[in-house]
Amino acid sequence: MAGNFWQSSHSQQWILDKPDLLRERQHDLLALNEDEYQKVFIFFANVIQVLGEQLKLRQQVIATATVYFKRFYARNSLKNIDPLLLAPTCILLASKVEEFGVISNSRLISICQSAIKTKFSYAYAQEFPYRTNHILECEFYLLENLDCCLIVYQPYRPLLQLVQDMGQEDQLLTLSWRIVNDSLRTDVCLLYPPYQIAIACLQIACVILQKDATKQWFAELNVDLDKVQEIVRAIVNLYELWKDWKEKDEIQMLLSKIPKPKPPPQR
């Protein structure tokens, strides 16, 4: 996407302040502590990733779907819509916006049913409960909550340009790209511009690969290095949390603690 980020709705409406983000979460944080809340979002980012891969979507589409998912819950409690319904809805919408092509509703439902049964049976004892009408209704609600701001700028393009400018090899790009994917399991996509996220992921990759010669290159960048370090800390904290998390043992308990949507009134 080659448009001007700074003039986009992403820049002007969807780079949020951390205090505002935390304030919107207060209802959910009565039921879950902050680590548990992040684990729930790691899990559903994994769900979106698996569904996207089984649908053979490009990573750009999967990343956009994950950002939609996080944007929705940046303004809504988990009780407003079941995350298991919102996840495939975000994929459906992202595939349209990223011009991937139309995913048939029946195929999407079939993939969801298969993935829950084969990949996430440790989290859900029951079958995937939703049908096409639920996803289409949810899509309208999602569009409304996103204010129809559907263009998402990702860190992948600036990352490619940075690695090219640095003159480094494919190993660095491959690792940095994976770290960008992992960053979708944090709040950084809601708080920082994509070029800052790209720089932070590149910096982490350089440390892992012990590329000391790149320090001067980073020092000469015209960028807010304090912001970059905030992103680095958020991603490192993710890895610390991930390292000790026994997802298959814990996720059912965490999902049971999520506030549930109120049933509609009986007529």
Curated annotation (Swiss-Prot):
Transmembrane feature ranges: none
CDD domains: CYCLIN_CCNC_rpt1, CYCLIN_CCNC_rpt2
Keywords, alphabetical: Cyclin, Developmental protein, Nucleus, Repressor, Transcription, Transcription regulation
Pfam families: Cyclin_C_2 (PF16899), Cyclin_N (PF00134)
Cellular component, GO annotation: CKM complex; mediator complex; nucleus
UniProt domain Cyclin N-terminal: residue ranges: 48-151
GO terms for biological process, alphabetical: chaeta development; imaginal disc-derived leg segmentation; positive regulation of transcription by RNA polymerase II; regulation of transcription by RNA polymerase II; sex comb development; snRNA 3'-end processing
Compartment(s) where it occurs, according to its Swiss-Prot or TrEMBL record: Nucleus
Quaternary context: Component of the Cdk8 module of the Mediator complex, composed of CycC, Cdk8, kto and skd.
Functional description taken from the UniProt entry: Component of the Mediator complex, a coactivator involved in regulated gene transcription of nearly all RNA polymerase II-dependent genes. Mediator functions as a bridge to convey information from gene-specific regulatory proteins to the basal RNA polymerase II transcription machinery. Mediator is recruited to promoters by direct interactions with regulatory proteins and serves as a scaffold for the assembly of a functional preinitiation complex with RNA polymerase II and the general transcription factors.
Name of the protein this chain belongs to: Cyclin-C
Gene: CycC
